[in-house]
Amino acid sequence: LAFPQESYVNRSEATRDAILSWFQSIPEKVAENVRQEVTVSVPAQEPDHVRLASLGRRTESPITVMEVTAEIGGTLYLRGQDYDGYDGMTWTVSQHRTEDFSLTGEDYGEVSIRTVGERALLYLPYYPARSMALIGGNMSNTWSYTEYVIPRAGLPDDWRITAISGTATPPDLNSPYLALPDATRARAEVLLADILGGASSTVEKAEKIGDYVRASARYDLNPSRMGEGETDFALWFLESAEAGYCVHFATAAAVLLRAAGIEARYVSGYLVKTAPGTPADVTEKNAHAWAEYYEPTLGAWLVLEATPSDMAAAQQPTPETV
C-alpha cells in the first residue's frame, strides 16, 4: 500500500505451513470459481506491523495494482489485512490466530478482480451474511492467483465456513479486540464520556464515535509527524493533531471503539468505486484503511468509515475505455 514504507515491517513466514495446510484441505472444485495464471514465483508478503510513530507524507503512486469489475457496481471495500494488536505506537497481526470471519456488506453481484503481478492476499469485498476462515488476519493468496472471480452469491461454498447471522458467541472480555494499554484506555474513556451521549446500542455508539473522529481533524496527505514524548498515537491524533489521512482516522476509531467496550480492529485494503459491468483500474491511490467493529446481534463485523469525505476524490478508480 502507498503509505510510508518505513511504517511497515514484512510478515515472517512462520505461518506459511499452517496456511498452506488449511488451503489444501479445501476441495479442488473451488478452482472452478477462479481463473488463474500459473506461476512459480512466491508473492511478496503483506506487512504484519504498522508502525504509527513514523507516519509522515503519504505517496500516491499512479501504478495500477488491479482491475476490478462489479456486476452491480458501487463503492467496494476490498479487504486485505486486519490487525488486532495495539500498543499505542504499532498495530500488529496475531500470527497464529484462526477465526471465522463474518462478511457483512452490500450485494455487488459478481465481482472480478485481476491483479497486475502477484499479490500476497486475495482482496475480497464484503457480502451479506458471508463468512470465511482467516489465518493470521487475512485470506492468503497461497495459489498465487492473479485473476479470480467472486460469484454473485458471494464466496464459493467451499470457502464459506458459516453463513448464519446471529449465531456468533458474545464478545470475550479477554478478547484481543478489546485490548488497550491501561493509560490509553483511561484517557479514551474521558473522551467517550462526552462522545457517546445517550447512545445505547453497539451501532449507535459506533456511529457517534465515527462522527467524532471524522470531525477531529482535516484530511491531509502530508500531516505533521507525532512529536517526541508522545506515548499513544491515537490519543495524540485526537487531542493534538490538526490533520491526518486514513491510517490516522482508522486507528483513532478502533481505539475509541475498544475503550467503549466494542470489539474492534484496524483493516487495510483498497476503497474503489465502480460503474456496473465496467472494468476499473485500481492504483495505490485507492489504498485505504478503516476500522471494523463486532456487532453481536448480527454476529458479524461491520465497517466503520472514520475518514472524512474529503478523501472521496482520492479513491476514484480509472474506468477503462474501449
What are these regions (language model features)?
Residues L1-V322:
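Helix-boundary/low-complexity linker signature
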